[in-house]
């Protein structure tokens, strides 16, 4: 193995992956409230745990953070006797142009900048180890006002190609099928939901313009796991003006024996998860009602809960004959359009299951 990129599972300080004593470089992406049960309910506590990956003399990089988070990261860097630098905007190419990114979304520019600085540092330290000063702590100020920015550099052709070819299934991903476009993003925190919603809003709008000869409908498939705040995650989605919203637990099918280890959580309480879906639907209706009062648009309160991802997908795609009022409303929506845009988000498990179905089922 020439290089290993190790991502922590939860936090950093006490995560099981935090066993590498001498990494080449460390990086921390934008912090958000996640895994609150384990990391604490404040951004300061989360930042403390995340900074647990810092190692003495190993350079660390992060993106611009909230002031309280940056203060904790800086203090932890000083404790661990290492430098911490904030990456600037993504370096331009040699001709001054902005590099193309294979993973779409404005928020990915920040991630790309962190990635290229981590890669550049790895190459420098591996190729010129004797020239690199391992401990830069003495030259660093660690208060938020003085946290140094990493130096910009021109991107080589290999960097440009890497950024352009980068692909992450389930992140800002589009899959086109006959009559349908699936937009998938496993965002599951408030900030990431806001970012991917902006991506979907712009991307779906562009598709509508490019296919102006077709009438379209927008459908949301949503779920999240854990103790996250449903209202906080659903609020950013209200502006998308969905024609129909579907909720389902992170179950591939309603048959337990169909679960696979790659995309299943075997510790989940199925009954509780299904109950949460109904709670999420109720919260969505409240969110949408509040949005009506602050927006000139009038969102449509059409939603439904399904027992599994497969049922939700096939109900949308197959559009079987139904008898209930809700189904009639859905049939009225889908029968009057030529193309359906389906946004799947809220959980990496949910997106993973959708990808599996799209790959294996005749959709």
Language model: regions and residue ranges:
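C-terminal helical cap/extension that packs against the catalytic core
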Residues: 66-79, 85, 182, 190, ...
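A glycine-rich beta-strand to alpha-helix segment
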Residues: 316, 328-359
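Short, acidic/turn-prone active-site loops that include or flank metal/cofactor-
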Residues: 30-34, 89-91, 223, 249-254
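Nucleotide phosphate-binding/pyrophosphate-handling subdomain across enzymes
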Residues: 2-6, 16-27, 31-35, 45, ...
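C-terminal lobe/tail of nucleotide-utilizing enzymes
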Residues: 90-133, 251-254, 304-332
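Glycine-rich phosphate-binding loop signature in dinucleotide/nucleotide-binding domains
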Residues: 1-2, 203-215, 319-341
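Structural motif
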Residues: 63-66, 186-187, 221-226, 249-250, ...
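Conserved catalytic-core segment of NTP-binding enzymes
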Residues: 9-82, 225-226, 231-234
């Amino acid at each position: 193995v020439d290089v290993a990129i190790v991502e922590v599972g939860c936090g950093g300080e006490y995560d099981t992956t935090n066993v590498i004593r001498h990494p080449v470089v460390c990086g921390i992406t934008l912090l958000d409230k996640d895994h609150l049960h384990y990391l604490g309910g404040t951004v300061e506590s989360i930042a403390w745990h995340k900074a647990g990956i810092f190692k003495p003399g190993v350079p660390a990089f992060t993106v611009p953070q909230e002031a309280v988070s940056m203060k904790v990261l800086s203090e932890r860097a000083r404790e661990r006797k290492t430098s911490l630098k904030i990456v600037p905007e993504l370096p331009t190419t040699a001709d001054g142009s902005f590099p193309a990114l294979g993973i779409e979304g404005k928020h990915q520019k920040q991630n790309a900048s962190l990635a290229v600085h981590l890669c550049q540092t790895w190459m420098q330290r591996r190729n010129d180890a004797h020239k690199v000063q391992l401990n830069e702590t003495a030259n660093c100020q660690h208060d938020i006002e003085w946290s140094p920015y990493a130096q910009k550099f021109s991107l080589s052709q290999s960097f440009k190609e890497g950024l352009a070819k980068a692909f992450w299934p389930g992140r800002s991903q589009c899959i086109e099928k006959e009559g349908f476009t699936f937009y998938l993003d496993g965002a599951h925190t408030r900030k990431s939901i806001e970012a991917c919603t902006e991506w979907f809003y712009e991307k779906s709008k562009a598709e509508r313009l490019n296919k102006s000869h077709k009438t379209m409908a927008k459908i949301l498939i949503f779920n999240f796991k854990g103790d996250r705040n449903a209202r906080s995650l659903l609020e950013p989605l209200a502006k998308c003006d969905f024609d129909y919203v579907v909720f389902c637990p992170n179950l591939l099918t309603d048959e337990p024996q169909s679960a696979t280890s790659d995309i299943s959580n075997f510790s989940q309480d199925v009954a509780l998860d299904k109950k949460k879906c109904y709670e999420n639907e109720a919260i969505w209706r409240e969110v949408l009602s509040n949005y009506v009062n602050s927006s000139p648009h009038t969102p449509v309160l059409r939603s439904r809960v399904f027992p599994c991802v497969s049922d939700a997908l096939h109900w949308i795609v197959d559009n079987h004959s139904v008898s209930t009022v809700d189904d009639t409303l859905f049939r009225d929506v889908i029968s009057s359009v030529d193309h359906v845009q389906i946004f799947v988000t809220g959980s990496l498990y949910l997106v993973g299951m959708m990808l599996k179905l799209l790959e294996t089922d005749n959709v």
